[in-house]
Amino acid sequence: MLAVGCASSQALGMQGHSNPNRELLDAAALCRELVPEGSVEAFLADHRQELFPDELFVDLFPSGRGRPSVPSDVIATVMVLQALEGLSDRDAARALRDRISWKVACGLSLDDEGFHHSVLTYWRARLRTSERPERIFDAVRAVVDATGVLQGKNRRALDSTLLDDAVATQDTVTQLVSAIRRVRRMIPGAAQAPLVAHDYEAGPKPLIAWDDPVAKQQLVSALVGDAHKLIQALESPELTVEQQEAVGLLALVAGQDVEPGEAEGTWRIAERVAPDRVISTVDPEARHMHKSRSSYRDGYKAHVAVEPETGLVTACSLTPANAADGPAGVALIADEDPGLEVLADSAYGSGEVRAALEQTKHRAVIKPIPLHTAVLGGFTIDDFAIDTSAGTATCPRGTTVAITPHGNAVFGPRCRDCPLRERCTRSRTGRAIRLHPHHDLLLAARRQAKTGGFKDSYRRHRPMVERSIAWLVARGHRRVRYRGVARNQLGLSMRVAAINLRRLINLGLDHDGGWVLQT
């Protein structure tokens, strides 16, 4: 039986192993028929030790001494089921204690009380700090490779989705007060600095008339002044890494939302928003991102690459919400063999992404970024004849100019008496075009998008990635559970592993001396 104690009594020590001998009240022996065939629980009951062998986790227990841990195949099974159902650690531990299907999946007896929920936190910490934090995802991916289900399937669809942060977004005042308090708490002597804007030992926010803009500006100015005083008082090379990070975060929040005021030494809220603005001192890695002018989220972004015929996720990554889709998408297929057909929407349509795919000998089936016109309904750059090899640009009227070394084609005074001027430019100085460094690639992409082959392939194969993302965020997974990129990357990889395993089971996964698909 598993112990029910806390993590420190269960998880420390040497690696535990599942007992190969069945106990008197073995759940699988007594209740296996209650677990539906074809379910993830039934599959794990039969094959969890082949999927998650002890050797997969042996490096997490280098000492080989002490009390045995919870068996690794049991922990991995619980983590997969937890990710599949979107349960908290507490609810997952409760499910292991009172659900027959979970006991069957983990090979426990009916009277086994399971383990304390903090054991899951401990194991995630060990995984995260190990050399292979995503080994459960890798184990499922190894099964994918062993079955050969992806053999000959040379398409990958890329997409991303925004995930809500696990903490509340903070305003400027809250961030400043929180960051100052953190520094005062973490660094000995910091509380002695003469700060005047607020009583930082008090719990509530500063007491002012919050509907008075002048009072709010004065408070912000005073808080920024306190932050600068505190930073200057702590310029010491003897700070620990954690203390340096706290001071660095204080410096960041003290500068990201403000600009110098009219009077010397004063500060005011800036009208612009910092492009990489920290939205919370509780989770400094989360970011703000607009999906459209009216739709936005604070948190992170999940990126996936999907094989569109099977729906299997071949790679995943997590970034702050404001990270660009293109570079993340290219990284997802970096380890793939050349010759893929890569499908994606226009968020991946930059010249840099197309150049990277061309360099790695992949074929892009990516929607082009829409062109903008200087005049509504007027000429776009595609109406100009651009010859990059000759270094010339010819306008719709037939006027040709040289392209400058910086990629500019300036028609200037040649537009003065042009009968097509109203369809081309409103500028008094005439039309000027700035060519993208990858102009030829972008032009080819726009032409490709008009072909029947592009449209057929895109419509047929790309929708699966959107379905995969719908599976990914179901059961409450639109909101991340943890703080920081590393923790949530591990959570994302666990969720993807669970989804991939369920998909493989639906495709007929079995183990008969090796992993095979029976369909």
Where are these regions (language model features)?
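Anion-binding and metal-coordination hotspots
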Residues: 91, 112-114, 120-519
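Carboxylate/His-rich catalytic cores and anion/metal-binding grooves
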Residues: 30
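Trp/Phe/Arg-rich N-terminal binding region typifying the photolyase-homology
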Residues: 60-74, 85-136
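Intrinsically disordered, low-complexity and often Lys/Arg-enriched segments
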Residues: 1-26, 511-519
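A short secondary-structure junction motif
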Residues: 54-55, 99, 103, 475
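Glycine- and acidic
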Residues: 59-62, 75-81, 105, 314-317, ...
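Basic, short loop/linker segments at the boundary and entry of helix-turn-helix/winged-helix-like folds
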Residues: 35-80, 84-85, 435-437, 441
